[in-house]
Design a protein with these regions (language model features):
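A cross-family kinase active-site recognition segment
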Residues: 2-6, 10, 116-172, 191, ...
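A conserved alpha-helical element in kinase catalytic cores
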Residues: 26-29, 64-108, 112, 116-137, ...
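ATP/Mg2+ or Mg2+-diphosphate-binding catalytic cores
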Residues: 16-19, 27, 163-164, 168, ...
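Conserved NTP-binding catalytic cores of kinases and kinase-like/nucleotidyltransferase enzymes
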Residues: 1-94, 206-210, 287-290
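Active-site acidic catalytic loop and adjacent metal/ATP-binding pocket
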Residues: 47, 51-62, 69-70, 97, ...
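Active-site Asp-x-Gly
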Residues: 205-258
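Short alpha-helical scaffolding segments that buttress acidic/His motifs in well-ordered protein cores
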Residues: 263-264
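An alpha-helical support segment within catalytic cores of ATP-dependent transferases
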Residues: 24-34, 142-196, 206, 251
Length: 290
């Protein structure tokens, strides 16, 4: 008798939010078994952390003994082009893509060893390492790369936030954030491929290179945007010294600190969320307001 597939708790919770996600989850056990057979992988238990909410991810070993990771992504707007991004960056500075099934959002990637997340290091060290990774990510794509413009993601967010208007706690703050979400993607100068979700939890210690990035969500747009996710993960420092924190990281990246601040404000004020009364985000938005 085949053992039931273990489903990480955060992924299970996410799949309860829509019928489409529930249908995806119902098909997942058969898909994982078929992929493991097709790619000759013996799987261990899946990762079950606070960050495994948008994919089923498990370490494994191939028939030749090589360590790998199988990832089957939950379909969502921001992560649609992850496989294309891994192909584009081709292992530098991302993990290597070994096999993929684009139609299933499934990928077999190299396993980082020891795999310790960068978040275990002091934040000032995180700043330097993430800045160096972003400099390597921001390379000019070839013609026909297929990555969507950043404006497509911010338009998606704007529509979701607008649909929640009756839940807003500060109409003026949200309206100002929405205005910037419409404006900033079209005023950033040279557009480059962006990771859009690069933070210290998505950077792992490895052997092939000291640090490798996982989970890219590529779009093309303003490089100043790519500063935001790491900064949002540095909440105590950002609350205590917002200007100093933003200026330091912007200087490491070589991007305009004012544009980073505007992106941070726009996201804190108007990015979609479950709780529009979140006091931490309201406080951050007010501290960074133009």
């Amino acid at each position: 008798m085949t053992a039931p597939l273990r489903i990480p708790r955060r992924l299970a919770a996410q799949c309860r939010t829509s019928p489409e996600h529930q249908a995806w989850l119902a098909c997942l056990p058969d898909r994982v078994r078929e992929l493991a057979t097709r790619w000759a992988v013996t799987l261990a238990s899946p990762f079950d952390t606070d960050e495994t909410s948008a994919a089923w991810v498990a370490p494994g070993t191939r028939a030749d003994g090589s360590p790998v990771v199988l990832k089957v992504a939950l379909p969502h707007m921001e992560g649609r082009d992850e496989i294309a991004g891994l192909r584009f960056w081709d292992g530098s500075p991302t993990v290597r893509l070994i096999e993929a099934d684009d139609s299933l959002g499934a990928m077999l990637i190299e396993q980082c060893r020891p795999g310790t997340a960068l978040r275990s290091r002091p934040e000032v060290e995180q700043d330097t390492i993430i800045a160096s990774l972003l400099h390597r990510l921001w390379r000019q794509p070839s013609e026909g790369h297929g990555f969507r413009p950043l404006a497509e993601m911010t338009a998606f967010w704007t529509a979701e936030t607008t649909s929640d208007r009756d839940q807003w706690h500060d109409d003026g703050l949200v309206a100002a954030g929405l205005e910037l979400l419409r404006e900033l993607p079209n005023t950033g100068g040279t557009a480059v491929p962006l990771a859009t979700d690069l933070h210290a939890g998505n950077v792992l210690r490895a052997q092939r290179q000291p640090w490798l990035m996982i989970d890219p969500k590529p779009f093309v747009g303003d490089p100043a945007y790519d500063a935001t996710q790491h900064l949002f993960n540095c909440r105590p420092r950002l609350h205590a010294h917002p200007a100093v924190t933003i200026d330091r990281f912007s200087d490491l990246l070589g991007v305009d600190a004012e544009r980073v601040r505007l992106w941070m404000f726009a996201r804190a004020a108007a990015e979609p969320r479950d709780d529009w009364s979140d006091p931490e985000l309201l406080s951050l938005a007010r501290k960074m307001a133009p």
